[in-house]
UniProtKB/Swiss-Prot annotation:
Alphabetized Pfam families for the sequence: NDK, Thioredoxin
This protein's name: Thioredoxin domain-containing protein 6
Disulphide-bridged cysteine pairs: none
Tissue-wise expression: Detected at very low levels in testis, lung and brain.
SUPFAM superfamilies: Nucleoside diphosphate kinase, NDK, Thioredoxin-like
General remark: Shows no detectable enzyme activity.
Family indicated by similarity: Belongs to the NDK family.
Superkingdom of the source species: Eukaryota
SMART domains on file: NDK
Compartmental location: Cytoplasm, Cytoskeleton, Cilium axoneme; Dynein axonemal particle
Gene: NME9
Keywords: Cell projection, Cytoplasm, Cytoskeleton
Organism: Homo sapiens (Human)
Gene Ontology cellular-component annotations: cell projection; cytoskeleton; dynein axonemal particle
Length: 330
C-alpha cells in the first residue's frame, strides 16, 4: 500500500527563538508575516502565496508566520496597526512591505527571489537593509488617557470608510478576487472581519431603506451568510476615500453598472438587486455611523485636535478622521 505524500504547510509558524534561528538559516528567501495576536495573520494574501508557491516552487521560496508578542526579536513590531512582511535571505533582512498590498508583495517577492538566486549562483553581494520606518513618528502605539482612563490604542491618522463584501459574493468564492481588486485600486485594508450580521444589526444598519419595497429581501440576504467587513483607507494622500470607494463599486444596480461602468466591482461581481456584491457608505457622515455600529469596540480620535479657547465645546473627530484600535481586541 503506497504512502501518501505529506502535505507541506504553506506558512511555517515561528513561535520560539529556536524556530526563528532555524528560519534565518534557511536557504533562499523567506517571507515572514509578522502579525498581532488580537487580529491574527493576514488572510487576504494567502491565495497569492499559494499561487506563487505553485509557480515558483519551494526550493528557494519560503513563507512563515510570527506573532510579534511571542518573540523578543520582534519587539519593535508590537502594536503595529497594519500587516508587516519581512523578507529574509542568508539570515539578513533584505526587504520590508507594510500593508496587505498584493501587487507590491508579488513584485517584491519576485525581485528579491531573483536577487537571491544571483547571490547563490554568481556570488553577488546581498543587499541588506535596516527597517528605517521603526522611528518614533511611525509608532502606532500611543499610551495616553481618554476620559480619565488609561488605554492602549493603535492609531492611523488617515481618512477611512466602511466596505462590505456581501454574502452573495462570499458564497460564490469571490472574496479574494475582490480584495485583490480593492488593493490594486490603491486602498489599504486596515481591518478585515468575516462574520454573519444579525437581523437586528441589518435592520439598524439599513434603517434608511426601511420604506423600500425590497427592504425585507435585503435584510434576509444580508443575514443569509457571512460577509467580510472591511475598514478602508487610501495609500496615497488624504483624498476623499468615501467617494473614491463608491466610484470603484459602481452604480447600485448591477445591470446599470454593467452598462455604465463595466469595470466596476458591482458590474463584475453583482447579479441583480439586492445581490450587488459590495456595500459602501453614502458619505462621510454615513461612514461614521456605520463604522461605529459595526465596530463598537474600536476607539476613534484625533490626537492633533485640541480644545478651543473661550469655553467652546471640545472639537472631536469622527471615525473617518482617525482610527484607533484597542490592542486587546479579540
Amino acid at each position: 500500500m503506497g504512502s501518501r505524500k505529506k502535505e507541506i504547510a504553506l506558512q511555517v509558524n515561528i513561535s520560539t527563538q529556536e524556530l526563528w534561528e532555524e528560519m534565518l538559516s534557511s536557504k533562499g528567501l523567506t517571507v515572514v508575516d509578522v502579525y498581532q495576536g488580537w487580529c491574527g495573520p493576514c488572510k487576504p494574501v494567502v491565495s497569492l502565496f499559494q499561487k506563487m508557491r505553485i509557480e515558483v516552487g519551494l526550493d528557494l521560496l519560503h513563507f512563515a508566520l510570527a506573532e510579534a508578542d511571542r518573540l523578543d526579536v520582534l519587539e519593535k513590531y508590537r502594536g503595529k496597526c497594519e500587516p508587516t512582511f519581512l523578507f529574509y535571505a542568508g539570515g539578513e533582512l533584505v526587504a520590508v512591505v507594510r500593508g496587505a498590498n498584493a501587487p507590491l508583495l508579488q513584485k517584491t517577492i519576485l525581485d528579491q527571489l531573483e536577487a537571491e538566486k544571483k547571490v547563490l549562483a554568481e556570488g553577488r553581494e546581498r543587499k541588506v537593509i535596516k527597517d528605517e520606518a521603526l522611528s518614533d513618528e511611525d509608532e502606532c502605539v500611543s499610551h495616553g488617557k481618554n476620559n480619565g482612563e488609561d488605554e492602549d490604542m493603535v492609531s492611523s491618522e488617515r481618512t477611512c470608510t466602511l466596505a462590505i463584501i456581501k454574502p452573495d459574493a462570499v458564497a460564490h468564492g469571490k472574496t479574494d478576487e475582490i480584495i485583490m481588486k480593492i488593493q490594486e485600486a490603491g486602498f489599504e485594508i486596515l481591518t478585515n472581519e468575516e462574520r454573519t450580521m444579525t437581523e437586528a444589526e441589518v435592520r439598524l444598519f439599513y434603517q434608511h431603506k426601511a420604506g423600500e419595497e425590497a427592504f425585507e429581501k435585503l435584510v434576509h440576504h444580508m443575514c443569509s451568510g457571512p460577509s467580510h467587513l472591511l475598514i478602508l483607507t487610501r495609500t496615497e494622500g488624504f483624498e476623499d476615500v468615501v467617494t473614491t470607494w463608491r466610484t470603484v463599486m459602481g452604480p447600485r444596480d448591477p445591470n446599470v453598472a454593467r452598462r455604465e461602468q463595466p469595470e466596476s466591482l458591482r458590474a463584475q461581481y453583482g447579479t441583480e438587486m439586492p445581490f450587488n456584491a459590495v456595500h459602501g457608505s453614502r458619505d462621510r457622515e454615513d461612514a461614521d455611523r456605520e463604522l461605529a455600529l459595526l465596530f463598537p469596540s474600536l476607539k476613534f480620535s484625533d490626537k492633533d485636535t485640541e480644545a478651543p479657547q473661550g469655553g467652546e465645546a471640545e472639537a472631536t473627530a469622527g471615525p473617518t478622521e482617525a482610527l484607533c484600535f484597542p490592542e486587546d481586541v479579540d
